[in-house]
């Protein structure tokens, strides 16, 4: 990627490419953080019974599985939505069925 | 690296806007926001785990899952009820809960990171 060429930020005028890169990196980092917050909250409900003096191995395994299954679920939903959108678009005029 | 930035970044009026400074400030704000988010969710979860029926003070609040315990007036009596995982005072429960929540958060963060790296490797 040629960062010394004219700015790739279409319509934004002369945006500093260094700042642009910074924004992209930080945005991605934030996306990660947000998902960690969300998954921790969800998995806490599933994996934590009574908080003890330390996180026992069963609870820890549960958290790991929970993360994996959450990502699986998310991917499944995206894939299936993509498929059903091809055959029968959801977000279109013909919503009534 | 030629570029258009420099002293003309925002030069009208007093002071120039230093992109480096802006980036540092943004990083700090992001970190603060994340800490607040963590605190908010942790407080929610630990309140649910440790405070059942709220009493007149933190000491006098029941922990959930102990029906008929009533308002805790005598901590000693509660101990003799031999519940190995329920600490005598909500504060101890909350403290443990906080530590466990941090453990959970770190575990989730690691697991998610591993999964992302695995996905990238498979592309």
UniProtKB/Swiss-Prot annotation, chain A:
Localization, UniProt: Mitochondrion inner membrane
Coiled-coil spans in chain: none
Superkingdom as given in the UniProt entry: Eukaryota
Keywords: Chaperone, Deafness, Disease variant, Disulfide bond, Dystonia, Membrane, Metal-binding, Mitochondrion, Mitochondrion inner membrane, Phosphoprotein, Protein transport, Translocation, Transport, Zinc
Biological processes, Gene Ontology terms: nervous system development; protein insertion into mitochondrial inner membrane
Keyword Transferase: no
Disulfide bridge positions per record: 43-66, 47-62
Phosphoserine modifications at: 57, 87, 94, 96
Keyword Metal-binding among UniProt keywords: yes
GO molecular function terms noted in the UniProt entry: identical protein binding; metal ion binding
InterPro entries, per database record: Tim10-like, Tim10-like_dom_sf
Topology relative to the membrane: Peripheral membrane protein
Record text on subunit structure and interactions: Heterohexamer; composed of 3 copies of TIMM8A and 3 copies of TIMM13, named soluble 70 kDa complex. Associates with the TIM22 complex, whose core is composed of TIMM22.
Family (UniProt): Belongs to the small Tim family.
Disease: Mohr-Tranebjaerg syndrome: An X-linked recessive disorder characterized by postlingual sensorineural deafness with onset in early childhood, dystonia, spasticity, dysphagia, mental deterioration, paranoia and cortical blindness.
Job of this protein: Mitochondrial intermembrane chaperone that participates in the import and insertion of some multi-pass transmembrane proteins into the mitochondrial inner membrane. Also required for the transfer of beta-barrel precursors from the TOM complex to the sorting and assembly machinery (SAM complex) of the outer membrane. Acts as a chaperone-like protein that protects the hydrophobic precursors from aggregation and guide them through the mitochondrial intermembrane space.
The protein's name: Mitochondrial import inner membrane translocase subunit Tim8 A
Gene assigned in the entry: TIMM8A
